[in-house]
């Protein structure tokens, strides 16, 4: 009855091999192959304004079976616009972590350590500053070869860059365990974001289980066992979070579909009977009926009632 595609902003214009063997834009293929059966809408959204806590611009395509097109448009199923949230509002209350610390009350509030010689590269950075811009060459990312400093190549401006507290969180990449990856440095502390912080940024519920232990069981483990488990599982968890679909965005779409399916959707004959029974030709009765929606009707049915009553008054 419905389908949803999510991909990069240029998804619909990207070339692909069509069923006939030719190269066509993905969007053209979708409309050709599915357009006969589905009403299709495509929108480019920055998820930061649609329920995610990080900035990520994506294409979302929603299709609705034409059998239901009289009652719902795919546009109605998109998540609602919301104001973006700052990183501080999302993770600002998380406890600070010492070097290599695993939070005693939250196993997932921990970060992957890195060689301590690299710490001076980011230690003095203010929000928005990059380690490659440090004046001291020893504080710029480098390696030592035959006793000589060899600077690392700066391929991206957002590597080794301290994030802003009062801006929306950045897009989360798969190698979010590394300082050398994009937008990974905590706004205040000399570390990457913890798994728990990443979960909050990506709207993954706190109760989600990454391993077959409850949080209480994980918190009760001896420190040695905690470190061993993190060593085994942390990279897989982080890579699953990076580039993931923000759960809250698609929860809203699913909720909109669920609400639609639970509503009544009337034919024209039933709508005319409803107008008669509720005396909806009276404007005041119509307004109250739409506001209260006593029959739990879908938007299309309510709009049709308003349309028919207005035409009858004319």
Language-model segments: residues:
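Class I S-adenosyl-L-methionine
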Residues: 1-159
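C-terminal target-recognition/interaction regions appended to catalytic cores
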Residues: 109-314
């Amino acid at each position: 009855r419905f389908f949803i595609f999510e991909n990069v902003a240029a998804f619909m214009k990207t070339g692909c091999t069509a069923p006939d063997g030719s190269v066509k834009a993905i969007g053209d293929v979708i409309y050709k192959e599915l357009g006969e059966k589905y009403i299709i809408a495509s929108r480019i959204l920055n998820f930061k304004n649609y329920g995610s806590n990080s900035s990520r611009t994506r294409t979302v395509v929603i299709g609705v079976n034409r059998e239901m097109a009289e009652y719902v448009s795919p546009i109605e199923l998109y998540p609602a616009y919301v104001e973006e949230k700052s990183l501080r509002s999302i993770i600002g209350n998380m406890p600070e972590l010492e070097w290599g610390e695993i939070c005693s009350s939250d196993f997932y509030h921990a970060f992957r350590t890195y060689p301590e010689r690299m710490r001076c590269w980011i230690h003095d950075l203010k929000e928005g500053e990059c380690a490659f811009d440090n004046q001291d060459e020893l504080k710029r990312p480098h390696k030592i070869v035959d006793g000589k400093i060899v600077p690392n190549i700066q391929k991206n401006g957002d590597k080794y860059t301290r994030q802003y507290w009062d801006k929306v969180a950045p897009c989360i990449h798969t190698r979010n365990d590394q300082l050398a990856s994009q937008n990974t440095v905590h706004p205040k502390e000399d570390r990457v974001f913890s798994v728990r912080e990443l979960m909050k940024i990506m709207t993954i519920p706190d109760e989600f289980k990454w391993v077959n232990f409850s949080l209480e069981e994980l918190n009760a483990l001896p420190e040695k066992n905690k470190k061993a488990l993190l060593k085994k599982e942390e990279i897989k968890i982080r890579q699953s979070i990076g580039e993931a679909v923000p759960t809250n965005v698609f929860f809203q779409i699913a909720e909109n579909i669920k609400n639609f399916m639970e509503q009544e959707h009337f034919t024209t004959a039933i709508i005319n009977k409803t107008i008669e029974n509720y005396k909806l030709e009276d404007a005041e009765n119509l307004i109250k009926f739409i506001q209260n929606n006593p029959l739990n009707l879908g938007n299309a049915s309510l709009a049709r009632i308003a349309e028919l009553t207005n035409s009858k008054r004319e």
